[in-house]
C-alpha cells in the first residue's frame, strides 16, 4: 500500500496517538498558507503593487522558502537567520511578527483543530 501512495507523495508511518496532530498539520496548514499568501499579497497591494504581481511574488517566495527548507539540513530558524541582517529590515519584520504572536497563533490554531477533532470523534 505504501508503494502506491509513495508514487504521488511521501508516506508516513505514525502511531494512532500521533494521527490527530498529523491530521491538523497536514490537513489544515494548506489553508493557513493560503491565508499567509493572501496577507502578503494584500500588503503588497496596499503598498502599490498590482494584485496579480503581489500574489505571484508571494507564491514564488513561499515556494522558494519551502523548497529550501525541504532540501536543507539546517533548521528553519537557521535558514531564517541567513536572510536577517543585524539591524536590517527583515529582522525588523520578523521581530514584529513575533511581538504580534505569529508563532503563538499558529500553535493555538493547531491546538484548536485537535480539540475540535476530539469533540467530533474523528480520531
Put a short name on every predicted segment:
Residues 25-26, 31-37, 123:
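Catalytic, metal-anchored helix/loop core of enzyme active sites in primary metabolism
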Residues 1-21, 33-71, 116:
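Internal alpha-helical scaffold of NAD(P)-dependent oxidoreductase catalytic cores
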Residues 10, 27-30, 88-89:
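Gly/Ser/Thr-rich helix-start
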Residues 23-25, 84:
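Short glycine- and Lys/Arg-enriched binding-loop motifs that mark or flank ligand-binding interfaces
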Residues 25-26, 49-51, 78:
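A ubiquitous short alpha-helical element
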Residues 21-23, 92:
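A short acidic, helix-capping loop that chelates divalent metal ions and anchors anionic groups
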